[in-house]
Swiss-Prot record:
Zn(2+) 1 binds at residues 51, 73-74, 169. Zn(2+) 2 binds at residues 104, 107, 110, 118. Its cofactor is Zn(2+). The gene is GS. Homodimer. The keyword RNA-binding does not apply. It catalyses: (19E)-geissoschizine + NADP(+) = 4,21-dehydrogeissoschizine + NADPH. Alcohol dehydrogenase involved in the biosynthesis of ajmaline-type monoterpenoid indole alkaloids (MIAs) natural products, important plant-derived pharmaceuticals used in the therapy of heart disorders. Catalyzes iminium reduction on 4,21-dehydrogeissoschizine to produce 19E-geissoschizine, precursor of vomilenine, an intermediate chemical in the biosynthesis of ajmaline. This is Geissoschizine synthase.
């Protein structure tokens, strides 16, 4: 029951990387995970993705980081132990863990496959388990995890874990809202604002859906990679008013992947057809102006979205495997982590980082 607490047996020795305080200084952190229960899966972590959100959480940008903090909400590995009542997995299976490791299981959202919108979620990193008397969860940037089998994902056989692990963040973040709004149908024309970690994978999904992808970016230098490397059909700089006007009323949807609200809402709404939709998956730090007239006259919509439920997580991995979709990923060792965080801060990454945990992070007494 929500609100009840029971002291857990914490016996699994673990080591992760994270921060002791808001200075953001990264360091090894030793801790204990719970003893695997009858429905738990014990996982040897092999890869952990790193993204902008991790950098912000390490430095307590949003004001709710709990220290010591071990980050990691996109994790891939292999099963090394299963509880007596686990049915989905066996030792040796390749698996993944996304941003959630628990939820209440009783609310409307949980009952309808939207566990990510549970009002009492247990996030993979930094959440406080209801049953653990205030002990925070520790993320996947560690050598081992213990997770309820419900929140463990089956890893497709033909999907590489090193370049596939960012799908547990960047992939689900764009897949979920596009599917929900029907933009996964062939023939849809979708604009993608920004060509970073989210935008690049959005383009790949759109093309696999059978749609048309137009990238809108602040940087002309990204045109070649958008079209030649990711398969975009068209590319427009967001200051090219002539080309943008020519695209007015042609798009079924626009996915804004940028965090800074750099593209005016009026511009995005102007690109939409009647009944079109703007999907906000970035997190603007400032308020933007909302032009109401284009919404009313075109019956257009603006929606926000945050990751996806467990079913959608699995669908994302399976769809990516079916269409040979992986993320453009730079695989690094744990000793490079501080440099990687600085590069993320300076927008110097193309397009995601994944830490080779299995070969570079070991527990030592």
């Amino acid at each position: 029951m929500a609100g009840e607490t029971t002291q857990l047996d914490l016996s699994v020795k673990a080591v992760g990387w994270g921060a002791a305080d808001a200075s953001g200084t990264l360091q090894p952190i030793k801790f204990y995970r719970r003893t695997p229960g009858e429905r738990d899966v014990k996982i040897r972590v092999l890869y952990c993705g790193v993204c902008n959100f991790d950098m912000e959480m390490v430095r307590n940008k949003w004001g709710f980081t709990r220290y010591p903090y071990v980050f990691g909400h996109e994790t891939a590995g292999e099963v090394i132990e299963v509880g007596s009542k686990v049915q989905k997995f066996k030792v040796g299976d390749k698996v993944g863990v996304g941003c959630m490791v628990g939820s209440c299981g009783k609310c409307f959202n949980c009952q309808n496959g939207m566990e990510n919108y549970c009002p009492e979620p247990n996030m993979a990193d930094g959440s406080v388990y209801r049953e653990q008397q205030g002990e925070p969860s520790f993320g996947g940037c560690s050598n081992v995890m213990v997770v309820d089998e419900k929140f463990v994902l089956r890893w497709p056989e033909n999907l590489p874990q090193d370049t596939g692990v960012p799908l547990l963040c960047a992939g689900i973040v764009v897949y979920s809202p596009m599917k929900y709004m029907g933009l996964d149908k062939p023939g849809k024309h979708i604009g993608v604002i920004g060509l970073g970690g989210l935008g690049s994978i959005a383009v790949k999904f759109i093309k696999a859906f059978g749609g048309k992808a137009t990238v809108i970016s602040t940087s002309k230098r990204k045109e070649k990679e958008a079209i030649e490397e990711h398969g975009a059909d068209a590319f427009v700089v967001n200051t090219d008013t002539e080309k943008l006007q020519a695209l007015a009323g042609t798009m079924d949807g626009v996915v804004d992947t940028t965090p800074g609200g750099r593209t005016p809402m009026s511009l995005m709404l102007n690109l939409l057809k009647f009944d079109g939709v703007v999907l906000l998956v970035g997190a603007p730090e400032t308020l933007f102006e909302l032009p109401v007239q284009p919404l009313i006259l075109g019956r257009r919509k603006i929606i926000g979205s945050s990751t996806g439920g467990l079913k959608e997580y699995q669908e994302t991995l399976d769809f990516a495997a079916q269409h040979n979709i992986v993320c453009d990923t730079e695989v690094i060792g744990i000793d490079y982590l501080s440099t990687a965080m600085e590069r993320i801060k300076n927008l110097d990454v193309k397009y995601r980082f994944a830490i080779d945990i299995g070969n570079t992070l070991k527990y030592e007494d």
